[in-house]
Amino acid sequence: MSNAINQNGTGLEQQVAGLDLNGGSADYSGPITSKTSTNSVTGGVYVPPHLRGGGGNNNAADAESQGQGQGQGQGFDSRSGNPRQETRDPQQSRGGGGEYRRGGGGGGRGFNRQSGDYGYGSGGGGRRGGGGRFEDNYNGGEFDSRRGGDWNRSGGGGGGGRGFGRGPSYRGGGGGSGSNLNEQTAEDGQAQQQQQPRNDRWQEPERPAGFDGSEGGQSAGGNRSYNNRGERGGGGYNSRWKEGGGSNVDYTKLGARDERLEVELFGVGNTGINFDKYEDIPVEATGQNVPPNITSFDDVQLTEIIRNNVALARYDKPTPVQKHAIPIIINGRDLMACAQTGSGKTAAFLVPILNQMYELGHVPPPQSTRQYSRRKQYPLGLVLAPTRELATQIFEEAKKFAYRSRMRPAVLYGGNNTSEQMRELDRGCHLIVATPGRLEDMITRGKVGLENIRFLVLDEADRMLDMGFEPQIRRIVEQLNMPPTGQRQTLMFSATFPKQIQELASDFLSNYIFLAVGRVGSTSENITQTILWVYEPDKRSYLLDLLSSIRDGPEYTKDSLTLIFVETKKGADSLEEFLYQCNHPVTSIHGDRTQKEREEALRCFRSGDCPILVATAVAARGLDIPHVKHVINFDLPSDVEEYVHRIGRTGRMGNLGVATSFFNEKNRNICSDLLELLIETKQEIPSFMEDMSSDRGHGGAKRAGRGGGGRYGGGFGSRDYRQSSGGGGGGRSGPPPRSGGSGSGGGGGSYRSNGNSYGGNSGGGGYYGGGAGGGSYGGSYGGGSASHSSNAPDWWAQ
């Protein structure tokens, strides 16, 4: 039955309008008719339950002088104010409305009876809150504020909005009344906010200030602080910014605990059964005033947040790269770190960087002529990675060390929904992990500014240059308003650092420390490497036999994962289909897969649902997948550095692993380098490799892409080239020659860039640096007397 007014009777709203539901007396006690209900009954207008709450005023006369309040959005389409009054004078009151289960509206455009002046309304409550002036679209809510009047004269701030953090969602409270053209109107707005509703049966119990934004106060709208969602109002329940985000806030303070998130981040720990073997790995740090290394995390001053998260991550003691890198970074020095894969490089730079960011706290946006937009983020830290998978992995680690803090990490990579990543940026970020292409795109869109960068990390730097990212990296570092070298702290991490990379680093690093952990460019002795001669047509049969032996082996468990590498995308799809037809639980990953498919494949592989993963090189670099017991090189790569990274997926963090490679005539180009690697890691040497290497040596073939003096003598980044001694008979000035086959001799030269001098290696005949001199590893494999280019003890060649 309709409640509308009709000629023969009264509607339900009219019948209840004169009732005093609060125990008082109605303003009008006579019979309620259609003639008296709208004009005569001024004090008892019935407010339906879904319209009761924060902003609506039950007294129409008061609302006329004070303006409509802040609609609080209690789960319905709430529009404050009386619609009949609004039609009488559309200029008189504009109460903000809220959408279903979203934030309430802003304070209305009020009319003052005494002065006859109209006040300007506040910003409407946007999605999950909002309010205030246009740029303050985060105050009390998430985003998307609607502008209401001149921001200098804005009315009440937006409603508190629902909290967007984890945990239950609660209705937000009303914002403050703000300022108006007339002081009396502002005072009326404050009185209105404090006024109790006439009908309190729907009133909710009080909550503490800051719990859900209900105590936003007068200054909830109009907050202009950078990244400050809730410094003086607003902020949703369980929001990291609910206690404020301004310069007066202690960012080192440990936040509230979230047990569900804690299990999600730290639920699985794997320290490795052979971790103590790392204690004997030699470490070399070169540079000026190198800080002393630490032996435990207690030896360095860390914030309470970092200590708590390190304990949750089950990091009982630092790895060798962490022992040296953490004190170097905390002391503000630039660093080039070269460590074997799986040695904890990610935590080595995340722990000290986030620790310094917590101590640094709030950094205001840069001063510029243009008006600052809250939609543009100015992070303090930037981590560049070559692949989407590595960027995602670093981001997951960053979330661990940012747990219970006010700092928010974000990840940017190509192949995913751009708008989704932009929404994540709009929520705020202090540390960005990104691939170079997508970061440049976001900078072009005006979503990210680099003016506040204090910490820059290039992870897997050699891989990024191999993939052709050097122009983009140079634009990001040198041309897009990033603070110059010396004003920011720059770190480069990778498992390999050829000399060309070290020379490039001189443009990005200032007075850096070179850190070499373990045999540079080598692989772990925890990995048992087996090389099998397999003709190309027989590879699939050998693979089936190998997988069957793994599955039937005594050490096989359901958590034992097998990673198979192939060279081409087509080969990955073909091999996956073949193994699937042979009833093996298998999935695959390569560059033509969508990001969603790649993430799903990695999830199935990590969980053990598909314990066999066929992959191209896209998954070879940096991915930390626990429990990979066996790596199979179905197709060997063309260079030994790629081989090192592939087999580095197993034997991580001290665990034992197995790597099996299929070798045939097609892999002759990698034979000599691979033989060196096997000798170095004390592996069994197949006779066919010795014969093939011997044939190549006597043939005088030129080694492509390598300097004279052999793999470890000239071009692999085994030493800090700033300490190499220049000179030598017949040497030339400029970059060292890249040729140098069997029997080639002659001294190195010198290279100088930006004040950093790199002396070339003296001598260096033959493949292994034999003869007179021969570079860093000269004499290790070649005959004759070798003189090393450094005066320090050369434990690399021992």
Swiss-Prot record:
<dbReference type="InterPro" id="IPR027417">
    <property type="entry name" value="P-loop_NTPase"/>
</dbReference>
<dbReference type="GO" id="GO:0016442">
    <property type="term" value="C:RISC complex"/>
</dbReference>
<dbReference type="GO" id="GO:0010629">
    <property type="term" value="P:negative regulation of gene expression"/>
</dbReference>
<feature type="short sequence motif" description="Q motif">
    <location>
        <begin position="295"/>
        <end position="323"/>
    </location>
</feature>
<keyword id="KW-0943">RNA-mediated gene silencing</keyword>
<feature type="modified residue" description="Phosphoserine">
    <location>
        <position position="214"/>
    </location>
</feature>
<dbReference type="GO" id="GO:0048477">
    <property type="term" value="P:oogenesis"/>
</dbReference>
<dbReference type="InterPro" id="IPR014001">
    <property type="entry name" value="Helicase_ATP-bd"/>
</dbReference>
<feature type="compositionally biased region" description="Gly residues">
    <location>
        <begin position="118"/>
        <end position="132"/>
    </location>
</feature>
<dbReference type="GO" id="GO:0016887">
    <property type="term" value="F:ATP hydrolysis activity"/>
</dbReference>
<dbReference type="GO" id="GO:0002168">
    <property type="term" value="P:instar larval development"/>
</dbReference>
<feature type="compositionally biased region" description="Basic and acidic residues">
    <location>
        <begin position="198"/>
        <end position="209"/>
    </location>
</feature>
<dbReference type="GO" id="GO:0030154">
    <property type="term" value="P:cell differentiation"/>
</dbReference>
<feature type="region of interest" description="Disordered">
    <location>
        <begin position="16"/>
        <end position="248"/>
    </location>
</feature>
<keyword id="KW-0378">Hydrolase</keyword>
<feature type="region of interest" description="Disordered">
    <location>
        <begin position="778"/>
        <end position="798"/>
    </location>
</feature>
<comment type="similarity">
    <text>Belongs to the DEAD box helicase family. DDX3/DED1 subfamily.</text>
</comment>
<dbReference type="GO" id="GO:0035075">
    <property type="term" value="P:response to ecdysone"/>
</dbReference>
<dbReference type="GO" id="GO:0035194">
    <property type="term" value="P:regulatory ncRNA-mediated post-transcriptional gene silencing"/>
</dbReference>
<feature type="compositionally biased region" description="Gly residues">
    <location>
        <begin position="740"/>
        <end position="750"/>
    </location>
</feature>
<keyword id="KW-0347">Helicase</keyword>
<dbReference type="GO" id="GO:0000070">
    <property type="term" value="P:mitotic sister chromatid segregation"/>
</dbReference>
<dbReference type="GO" id="GO:0005524">
    <property type="term" value="F:ATP binding"/>
</dbReference>
<feature type="modified residue" description="Phosphoserine">
    <location>
        <position position="179"/>
    </location>
</feature>
<keyword id="KW-0597">Phosphoprotein</keyword>
<dbReference type="InterPro" id="IPR014014">
    <property type="entry name" value="RNA_helicase_DEAD_Q_motif"/>
</dbReference>
<keyword id="KW-0896">Oogenesis</keyword>
<protein>
    <recommendedName>
        <fullName>ATP-dependent RNA helicase bel</fullName>
        <ecNumber>3.6.4.13</ecNumber>
    </recommendedName>
</protein>
<dbReference type="InterPro" id="IPR000629">
    <property type="entry name" value="RNA-helicase_DEAD-box_CS"/>
</dbReference>
<feature type="modified residue" description="Phosphoserine">
    <location>
        <position position="219"/>
    </location>
</feature>
<keyword id="KW-0744">Spermatogenesis</keyword>
<feature type="modified residue" description="Phosphoserine">
    <location>
        <position position="638"/>
    </location>
</feature>
<comment type="function">
    <text>ATP-dependent RNA helicase that is essential and required for cellular function, larval growth, and for male and female fertility. Also required for RNA interference (RNAi), double-stranded RNA induces potent and specific gene silencing, by acting downstream of dsRNA internalization. RNAi is mediated by the RNA-induced silencing complex (RISC), a sequence-specific, multicomponent nuclease that destroys or silences messenger RNAs homologous to the silencing trigger.</text>
</comment>
<dbReference type="GO" id="GO:0043186">
    <property type="term" value="C:P granule"/>
</dbReference>
<dbReference type="InterPro" id="IPR001650">
    <property type="entry name" value="Helicase_C-like"/>
</dbReference>
<keyword id="KW-0067">ATP-binding</keyword>
<keyword id="KW-0963">Cytoplasm</keyword>
<dbReference type="GO" id="GO:0005737">
    <property type="term" value="C:cytoplasm"/>
</dbReference>
<dbReference type="GO" id="GO:0010468">
    <property type="term" value="P:regulation of gene expression"/>
</dbReference>
<dbReference type="GO" id="GO:0036098">
    <property type="term" value="P:male germ-line stem cell population maintenance"/>
</dbReference>
<dbReference type="GO" id="GO:0007283">
    <property type="term" value="P:spermatogenesis"/>
</dbReference>
<feature type="modified residue" description="Phosphoserine">
    <location>
        <position position="177"/>
    </location>
</feature>
